[in-house]
Regions:
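Short active-site segment of divalent metal-dependent hydrolases/proteases
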Residues: 103-111, 217
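Active-site alpha-helix of zinc metalloproteases
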Residues: 99-100
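Short coil/turn residues that cap or connect secondary-structure elements
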Residues: 46, 91, 107-110
Length: 312
């Protein structure tokens, strides 16, 4: 038994719905080494220049004089950890999960979703198509890295990155199998068709895990950041929500993880219970109304837009 075969022994204990290493597809075949395919994707991502640029990107709050506020790098690490916890409990491919989690926000821009909205507006004005950060993450990895040659990741990893959507929560996540050509068509359609990104479904169960973990990672953490900046108080959280999923980031993360695991074991899809899913939706709505809509002043947004416009 060679080293790679030893590393792949864990696949014997995989769920029948997990993605096996031999199922990895690349646009350009590569020479094998001791590392499993999706493990190599992790290495290629963390050694990319795009990954290095995570370092100073902000999450929700920008230009704040507080070192304890979450940055984009922290967020992707949290997504990776949460997703791997769920993946391990469900006996899925943790390498694919980690690769997708670490790469999912590579295309995010300064000033978070506000920056994304501004760039979308500018991009359309210049006839460059719709701008979505998940699509730009794939573009970084396929078309920009390595002097425009890309770093040749597995299609399953790229698809999970393309299909992540922290803005859209679902009670159930059913993977949608697709060919390489269908993935490439999805990628192209995101530039051409308004709202197309909202229709995307990951082609693996691992991709679905990363998608829901993105939401789990930011909900409670953003509340903590807002409390540090005195934007909200813990008592502001509605009791109808906290009674179900908790009031601290630790409680929220644990409740959501355990609910997904308990409702998804031995299933070909992910599922949340009715009451937890409703609480998640209400908490997300609370965050939008009390945190995200107040994270930037009108003056700051105007300044951001002027900066982007001058650089475009």
């Amino acid at each position: 038994m060679n080293i790679k075969e030893r590393m792949l022994l864990r696949e014997k204990f995989y769920s029948p719905y997990a993605t096996k290493d031999k199922e990895s597809i690349r646009l350009i075949p590569i020479e094998e080494d001791i590392r499993p395919n999706f493990f190599r994707d992790i290495d290629r991502i963390i050694h990319s220049t795009s990954y290095t640029r995570y370092m100073d990107k902000t999450q929700v709050f920008s230009l704040k004089d507080n070192d304890n506020i979450s940055k984009r790098m922290v967020h992707v690490q949290l997504v990776s950890k949460i997703a791997r916890t769920i993946g391990r409990a469900l006996s899925l491919n943790e390498d694919l999960i980690e690769a997708a989690a670490l790469g999912h926000d590579l295309g995010h821009v300064p000033f978070g979703h506000e920056g994304e909205r501004i760039l979308n507006k500018i991009s359309l004005k210049h006839n460059e198509g719709y701008f979505n950060h998940n699509v730009q993450s794939v573009r970084e990895l396929m078309d920009i890295e390595n002097d425009g040659e890309g770093i040749n990741l597995s299609i399953q990893t790229l698809d999970a990155i393309l299909c992540h959507n922290g803005e859209l929560e679902l009670k159930e996540y059913h993977p949608k199998k697709k060919t390489t050509d269908e993935f490439l068509q999805d990628y192209e359609n995101c530039y051409k068709i308004e709202g197309y990104t909202k229709t995307l479904i990951p082609n693996t169960l691992e991709g679905c895990v990363v998608r829901i973990s993105d939401i789990i990672a930011y909900l409670g953490r953003d509340i903590e950041d807002a409390e540090r900046l005195n934007l909200i108080k813990k008592e502001d959280l509605p009791k109808e929500i906290t009674d179900i999923i908790g009031s601290t980031n630790k409680e929220i993360v644990n409740t959501l993880i355990m609910d997904i695991i308990n409702n998804s074991i031995d299933k070909p899809y992910l599922k949340m219970s009715d009451n937890v899913f409703e609480a998640l939706k209400k908490l997300k709505k609370f965050n939008y109304e009390n945190i995200y809509s107040k994270a930037n002043t009108k003056e700051e947004l105007t300044e951001y837009e002027n900066m982007f416009e001058s650089l475009f």
